[in-house]
């Protein structure tokens, strides 16, 4: 795996956790996700990363990436070493191709749900997705598939908040709450409601796209260390 880089957002959040008492992420909700893009970087937003994530086809799913323990301080190398995370992906029904892997804290297991313009009610401002599993307050980003146009009132690259949930449909609010989003038309084609809970911790970009053939797997071993820059021994 290429060297991982912390995002600016995670560095800021870490400072708030360490020195201002902000709530740390749930240790069971770290997940590794994949994107077939080489253009994501440390300044990109959560919405940028989530909008680029692979679709849940050919068996793609976010991989659990939880630490098995606290790790130990390595006196020789002068750094605290956390247990290595193992995250695996497997292709089925077709290949998977990606170039960037990114770690999400406080994430949902589901990456995205698909729906079409026929599932959008511009009168009630509701989106119908059978057994969607979202709950009030969950964050979503919407994208349109090729040749599709998002419903009026929903903007690509914008994080929305799920509201007025039932088992099979929901409304939207602006991120952080507020009035129900007014859906002015149903749009056209197929869309994706992409899960945007959490924060992007770190990412790694491969030098060229990686293809996981149908029926095969690919594993990431993710080492994470904490150190004082300039004092560590080794690499």
Across the structure, where does each feature detected by a protein language model lie?
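Small/polar beta-strand repeat architecture
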Residues: 111-195
